[in-house]
C-alpha cells in the first residue's frame, strides 16, 4: 500500500476533535497516516468552527496562505470540513481554486470517496443534511485509539436555537444515538485498556428527550459507569434547562462520575438570557448549582460567558459579574459577542461599541483569574488521584488529570501512563498543578 501523510488542523469544540479522529480512521484503508508536520502531508484538512467570526476569518486566511504551496506541490490535496464547510459549501471551491474537497457535518461517511475523487483530479463539495434515520447509522468506530481517555458521541445536533448561535444551522437537529450501540463502544474501549470515557454531544444532557424510545441521559450515565474497566466517566456539554434531578443524583451516587461539570450560563441577567433564548432564568441556574453542590459538595463548575450581547447595559453586565461571584467558577471560557449571519441576534440593531465589549471582557476575565487562582491554591498540600495520560512538555515529567479535570504534571516515567496514582500537590499555577508521586 502506498503510504501517504494526512495533516488535520482541528479547531472548535470537542465534537470536531471527535470527528477528526473518525476521519483519520476512515482514511487509513486509503493508505493515509496522520502527521503533525504539515509540510510532509499529501492531504491537508481543516476541520473548522464558525461559532465566532474570528475562527472563520482565521480559517479563510490559512487557506489563502496555501496558494503558493499548491503551486509548488500541485499534488498536495487540500480539504475543508466542519461548520465553515457546512455553511459555505461549494463557495469555498469557487473562492479558492486550490481547494480540492469540502464536506459538511453530515457528510463524514463520504470522505474516502471524496478523497479518491480528489486524487483523480475531481473537485467536490458535499453539504447535504441527512434525515435522522440515515444519521443513526453514521457513527463509525474510531480505531487505533492508544490514549487513556476517549470521547464517545451519544448525540449530535441542537434544537435550542439560542438567538446568537449558529450551531443548529450547521450541525442540524438533535438526534440521540442508540443506547445499546453506545454501551458496546464503551465496552470495546474498556477491553482496549482505556480508563476514562467522556460522553459527548452538542447538548449532551438532552439525550433521549426528543420522543425517541431511549432511556434518559441519567440512565445512560449509570449504565456507562457500570462498565467494568472504566474508572472515570465525564460528559460535556450540558444545557442548564436539561439538568434533571435524576442526572444531578448521579453525582451523589456514582463514584466513577468525575466531580466536574461544564454548565454554560452565558449571562447573569434575566432580560439578556431571554433575549438569548436560553430557556432558563438566573434563579433557575443558581438553584441547579445549589442542587449539584448538595449532591457533590466538592464539584467543580466550569462555564461560558458572552460579553456585550446587543443592548446589554452596564447594570446587566454587573449581574453577570455577580453571578460569577455566587458560582465561583473553577474555569470560565469568555468571549465578546460575535454576530453570526442567519441568527436572530444578528438582526438586532443595538450592538455595543467594540471598545465597550472589550473593556467588559477584560473586567470579567480579571475576576475569573482571581477565582481560578483561589481554586488552585486550595489544592496545594492535598492528595489527588491522578489518571496519567501521557508525557508532559518538560523532560522527565508525565501529565494527567485529577477528578476535577485540572492538569497535573509530576516527575515520572512513561510506565505510569494509564495508571491512577496518588499525587501530593506542591504548587498551583494558572491552568495546571505540580505534584509528586506518593
Swiss-Prot record:
Q: Which GO terms describe its cellular component?
A: cytosol
* Residues involved in [4Fe-4S] cluster 1 binding: 13, 49, 83
Q: Which InterPro entries match?
A: Elp3/MiaA/NifB-like_rSAM, Methylthiotransferase, Methylthiotransferase_CS, Methylthiotransferase_N, Methylthiotransferase_N_sf, MiaB_methiolase, rSAM, rSAM_horseshoe
Is Hydrolase set as a keyword in this record?
no
The record lists its disulfide bonds as none
UniProt catalytic activity: N(6)-dimethylallyladenosine(37) in tRNA + (sulfur carrier)-SH + AH2 + 2 S-adenosyl-L-methionine = 2-methylsulfanyl-N(6)-dimethylallyladenosine(37) in tRNA + (sulfur carrier)-H + 5'-deoxyadenosine + L-methionine + A + S-adenosyl-L-homocysteine + 2 H(+)
Which GO MF terms are attached to this record? 4 iron, 4 sulfur cluster binding; metal ion binding; N6-isopentenyladenosine methylthiotransferase activity
| Database matches in CDD domains | Radical_SAM
EC? 2.8.4.3
Residues reported in the UniProt entry to bind [4Fe-4S] cluster 2: 158, 162, 165
Q: Where is the TRAM domain?
A: 377-438
Record-annotated MTTase N-terminal domain positions: 4-120
Quote the cofactor binding remark.
Binds 2 [4Fe-4S] clusters. One cluster is coordinated with 3 cysteines and an exchangeable S-adenosyl-L-methionine.
User: Where in or outside the cell?
Assistant: Cytoplasm
What HAMAP family would the database entry show?
tRNA_metthiotr_MiaB
Checking NCBIfam families in the record gives: miaB-methiolase, MiaB/RimO family radical SAM methylthiotransferase
Q: Which family does it belong to?
A: Belongs to the methylthiotransferase family. MiaB subfamily.
Q: What does this protein do?
A: Catalyzes the methylthiolation of N6-(dimethylallyl)adenosine (i(6)A), leading to the formation of 2-methylthio-N6-(dimethylallyl)adenosine (ms(2)i(6)A) at position 37 in tRNAs that read codons beginning with uridine.
- Under which name does UniProt file this protein? tRNA-2-methylthio-N(6)-dimethylallyladenosine synthase
Q: Which organism is it from?
A: Trichlorobacter lovleyi (strain ATCC BAA-1151 / DSM 17278 / SZ) (Geobacter lovleyi)
Upper classification of the source organism reads: Bacteria, Pseudomonadati, Thermodesulfobacteriota, Desulfuromonadia, Geobacterales
**Annotated gene:** miaB
Amino acid at each position: 500500500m502506498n503510504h501517504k501523510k494526512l495533516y488535520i488542523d482541528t479547531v472548535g469544540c470537542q465534537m470536531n476533535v471527535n470527528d477528526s479522529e473518525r476521519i483519520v480512521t476512515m482514511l487509513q484503508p486509503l493508505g493515509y497516516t496522520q502527521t503533525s508536520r504539515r509540510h510532509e502531508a499529501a492531504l491537508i484538512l481543516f476541520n473548522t468552527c464558525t461559532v465566532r467570526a474570528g475562527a472563520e476569518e482565521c480559517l479563510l486566511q490559512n487557506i489563502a496562505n496555501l496558494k503558493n504551496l499548491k503551486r509548488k506541490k500541485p499534488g498536495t490535496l487540500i480539504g475543508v470540513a466542519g461548520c465553515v464547510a457546512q455553511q459555505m459549501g461549494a463557495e469555498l471551491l469557487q473562492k479558492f481554486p486550490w481547494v480540492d474537497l469540502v464536506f459538511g457535518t453530515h457528510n463524514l461517511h463520504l470522505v474516502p470517496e471524496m478523497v479518491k475523487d480528489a486524487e483523480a483530479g475531481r473537485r467536490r463539495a458535499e453539504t447535504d443534511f441527512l434525515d435522522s434515520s440515515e444519521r443513526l447509522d453514521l457513527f463509525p468506530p474510531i480505531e487505533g485509539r492508544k490514549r487513556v481517555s476517549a470521547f464517545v458521541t451519544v448525540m449530535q445536533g441542537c434544537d435550542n436555537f439560542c438567538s446568537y448561535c449558529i450551531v443548529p444551522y450547521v450541525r442540524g437537529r438533535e438526534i440521540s444515538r442508540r443506547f445499546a450501540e453506545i454501551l458496546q463502544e464503551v465496552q470495546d474501549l474498556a477491553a482496549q485498556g482505556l480508563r476514562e470515557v467522556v460522553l459527548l454531544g452538542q447538548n449532551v444532557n438532552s439525550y433521549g428527550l426528543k420522543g425517541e424510545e431511549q432511556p434518559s441521559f441519567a440512565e445512560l450515565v449509570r449504565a456507562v459507569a457500570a462498565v467494568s474497566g472504566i474508572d472515570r466517566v465525564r460528559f460535556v456539554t450540558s444545557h442548564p434547562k436539561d439538568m434533571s434531578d435524576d442526572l444531578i443524583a448521579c453525582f451523589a451516587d456514582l463514584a466513577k462520575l468525575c466531580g466536574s461539570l461544564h454548565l454554560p450560563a452565558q449571562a447573569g441577567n434575566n432580560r439578556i438570557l431571554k433575549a438569548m433564548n436560553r430557556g432558563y432564568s438566573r434563579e433557575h441556574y443558581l438553584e441547579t448549582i445549589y442542587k449539584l453542590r448538595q449532591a457533590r459538595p466538592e464539584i467543580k463548575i466550569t462555564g461560558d460567558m458572552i460579553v456585550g450581547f446587543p443592548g446589554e447595559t452596564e447594570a446587566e453586565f454587573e449581574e453577570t459579574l455577580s453571578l460569577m461571584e455566587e458560582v465561583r467558577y473553577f474555569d470560565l471560557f469568555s468571549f465578546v459577542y460575535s454576530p453570526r449571519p442567519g441568527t436572530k441576534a444578528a438582526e438586532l440593531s443595538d450592538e455595543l461599541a467594540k471598545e465597550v465589549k472589550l473593556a467588559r471582557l477584560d473586567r470579567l476575565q480579571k475576576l475569573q483569574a482571581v477565582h481560578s487562582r483561589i481554586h488552585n491554591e486550595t489544592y496545594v498540600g492535598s492528595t489527588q488521584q491522578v489518571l496519567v495520560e501521557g508525557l508532559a512538555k518538560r523532560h522527565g515529567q508525565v501529565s494527567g488529570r485529577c477528578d476535577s479535570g485540572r492538569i497535573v504534571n509530576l516527575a515520572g516515567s512513561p510506565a505510569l501512563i494509564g495508571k491512577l496514582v496518588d499525587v501530593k500537590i506542591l504548587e498551583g499555577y494558572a491552568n495546571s498543578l505540580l505534584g509528586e508521586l506518593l
